[in-house]
Amino acid sequence: HNITYKIGYYLHLNNPKEWAFIILFSIIASLFFVFLDKLVLVGFQKRKIWSDTKYPIFNYFIWVITSVIFILGGTSVGYFISPDADGSGIPEMKTVLSGVPIYRYFSFNAFVGKSLGLFAVLVSGASVGKVGPYVHLSCLICTRLMKSNYFEKIDKSTSIKTTMLSVACATGITFALGCPLGGVLFSIESTASIYMVSNLWKSFFSSVICCFIFKMFYGETII
């Protein structure tokens, strides 16, 4: 019994609701990222079909024009939907995890704007990384889930809420990079000035679930 207690204390298993939240969040976030990836792939394939005509010069102009249209659409979401959708996401999350709140950074409009903006820019073929946006989107999903009635105690506790946001950062980076251990370590490096070691197990657990769902949908694709 003493050994079981020590293991439970070391792994911080004394709050089952936190682990239930991590499992549910990891599944929802991973499914959303898979959906977004599939949507980007479909959009890119549609662009290839549109530019596949008998005339090479038309193909070139159609490809360039559609690329410009998607880029303009992706960069306009900050103006038309939410200014909080602009930027990477990692510097802002580092600020939030340091204890400085950013007004409306986790709003629903920011989620819609970030999703549409990332989709449009990736479909355009622009050389834009997914790590920062996935961190922001992951934290947006985490925040929305914490607002539910069942997990309202997590949302009301500043320390637990910060822990869950750090877990969300690790999940977003893991899905973008495809590496659970590396994603967790990189999330510590990029988003935290002071890191609670007790959060390491939770972040790694969420990242493993993320990779498992990735494997389910992408099969033998290397991750």
Describe every region a protein language model picked out.
Residues 1-223:
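Alpha-helical transmembrane segments and immediately membrane-proximal extracytoplasmic
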